[in-house]
A protein has these predicted regions:
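Short, hydrophobic/π-rich interface segment
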Residues: 109-162
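Long, charge-dense
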Residues: 75-119
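Flexible glycine-/small-residue-rich
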Residues: 14, 66, 152
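Short, charge-patterned binding micro-sites
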Residues: 47-58
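Structured alpha/beta or helical-core interaction and ligand-binding surfaces enriched in interleaved
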Residues: 61
């Protein structure tokens, strides 16, 4: 998959209309809806970026990258339905000529306590209580990366953070597939 597959983008700015709901809450809802739309289209050619990200926040803007056709299918699916009061969407725009590229990927903590407990329970036939006693929450190492709190459309897992890692800027695109979240550990998205 070449850069031509990511020739267009949709920019979604998340708004915080009142004190009740934060920009990060809106971003979580937008990202969750996008995940559902990507999953329902069974596609791996849609990537995301967070151009206003900071050290600990993904920021208020989500860019969705893809071909004009892929983005049209996404919009036709109505993934921003009922979020219009909380977002400003650009519609489909061509990527500018002079851009850099970067990988926007999911990062996972190596020492997730729930994951280690499940493995311990499976391998040693322990109860959840025994596993919790052996592996307390305090062993977790927090990632110093921005995250989005989501619940999965494809599994019944409760809400969990997805940590977002922005790779170095590159002068050439790197092809590859994107996950159901629009993230990839190998493929790049246009960065501008």
């Amino acid at each position: 998959m070449g850069h031509s597959m990511l020739s267009h983008f949709i920019q979604v700015r998340c708004l915080s209309p009142d004190q009740e709901i934060t920009v990060q809450d809106i971003m979580s809802r937008v990202f969750y809806r996008l995940h559902g739309a990507i999953a329902s289209l069974h596609t791996s050619d849609v990537g995301v970026s967070f151009p206003n990200h900071t050290f600990m926040s993904v920021g208020d803007v989500l860019r969705v990258h893809g071909s004009k056709d892929a983005l049209t299918r996404l919009l036709d699916g109505g993934w921003l339905f009922r979020l219009e009061d909380y977002t400003l969407s650009s519609g489909i725009i061509s990527v500018p000529e002079q851009v850099k590229y970067r990988c926007v990927s999911r990062a996972r903590a190596k020492s997730s306590a729930p994951r280690l407990r499940r493995r311990l329970m499976r391998r040693h036939n322990l109860s959840e209580l025994e596993a919790k006693r052996l592996i307390p929450d305090s062993i977790e190492k927090r990632l110093n990366l921005p995250s989005i709190l989501v619940c999965s459309k494809t599994t019944s897992t409760p809400s969990y953070p997805i940590f977002i890692k922005h790779g170095p800027l590159l002068s050439s695109p790197v092809p590859g597939p994107f996950s159901g979240y629009g993230l990839s550990s190998e493929a790049t998205v246009p960065w501008f």
